[in-house]
């Protein structure tokens, strides 16, 4: 069985900036937290939006999963692997780590 990979917040930002990879960030935090701030261009992944994600993102595209601290994202990342996505990362440190690193946030 395929496994997701771990990625640091700085490596995640670098991967998102590599336009040739067409990586997508998905954020699984609650709607209020997502609304207060998220990574620029992040897709808010919920039970209600999973079908939309699967229609918009090819299985070959890298997918980075972010939660609050980097724990819940691991289960979601494995779920996406099980759905057929080939390159899935759990962002270590989550949104809190992203903020602490001073990386850009969209509000």
From Swiss-Prot:
Gene Ontology CC annotations of this record: cytoplasm
Enzyme Commission designation: 2.8.1.1
EC category: transferase
InterPro entries xref list: GlpE_sulfurtransferase (IPR050229), Rhodanese-like_dom (IPR001763), Rhodanese-like_dom_sf (IPR036873), Thiosulf_sulfurTrfase (IPR023695)
Domain Rhodanese: 19-107
Recorded GO MF terms: thiosulfate-cyanide sulfurtransferase activity
Keyword Transferase: yes
Keywords associated with the record: Cytoplasm, Transferase
Catalytic reactions of this protein: thiosulfate + hydrogen cyanide = thiocyanate + sulfite + 2 H(+); thiosulfate + [thioredoxin]-dithiol = [thioredoxin]-disulfide + hydrogen sulfide + sulfite + 2 H(+)
SUPFAM superfamilies assigned to the protein according to its UniProt record, in alphabetical order: Rhodanese/Cell cycle control phosphatase
Subcellular location, record wording: Cytoplasm
Active site: 67 (cysteine persulfide intermediate)
Coiled-coil residues: none
Similarity annotation: Belongs to the GlpE family.
HAMAP family in the record: Thiosulf_sulfurtr
Record's protein name: Thiosulfate sulfurtransferase GlpE
């Amino acid at each position: 069985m395929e496994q997701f990979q771990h990625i640091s917040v700085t490596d995640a930002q670098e991967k998102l900036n590599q336009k040739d990879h067409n990586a997508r960030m998905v954020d699984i935090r609650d709607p209020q937290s997502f609304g207060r701030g998220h990574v620029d261009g992040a897709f808010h992944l919920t039970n209600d939006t999973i079908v939309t994600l699967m229609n918009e993102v090819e299985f070959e595209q890298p997918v980075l999963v972010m939660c609050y601290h980097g724990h819940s994202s691991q289960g979601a990342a494995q779920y996406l692997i099980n759905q057929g996505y080939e390159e899935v990362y759990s962002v270590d440190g989550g949104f809190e780590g992203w903020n602490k690193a001073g990386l850009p946030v969209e509000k």
